[in-house]
Amino acid sequence: MSASDLLGSGSDSQPGVIDEAHLTRMTLGDRGLERELLQIFVGQSATILDRITGHDPAAIAAAAHTMIGSARGIGAWRVARAAEQLERVVDEGNENALDEAIAALKSASQEANTAIGARLVDPSRHISDCA
């Protein structure tokens, strides 16, 4: 998978890790605000992933719901979909699918945070340039 497949301008059907166009719209092109939102997402995603470790259904559902909003805010569509799936699994009481849904959210979050980390190290780069 190329960097352009993973990162950058993605549509909802073929999303990148972060939808650069969506992020730019959400921040009105303000690179400082963009950086701040990305930093908040990285910190918040770590906290959220810690909350889902205990397998308390109410905490997992609340954490997944929070992650959905955070991910949508920056255009991290894969993370949002993984969090939606986790929330659905918890709401349905499907304990057999819980571990798989948690693993999918962790994987999508790690992928997004890696791309964001590369962007934060070199702010002149767009996420589509980060591999």
Q: Model-derived features: where do they sit?
A:
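Long, amphipathic alpha-helical coiled-coil segments characteristic
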Residues: I18-T66, G73, A97-L120
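Intrinsically disordered or compositionally simple regulatory linkers and C-terminal tails
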Residues: M1-P15, V121-C130
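Mid-chain, well-packed structural core segment of small domains
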Residues: A71-G73, A83
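Eukaryotic all-alpha helical interaction scaffolds
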Residues: A71, V89-V90
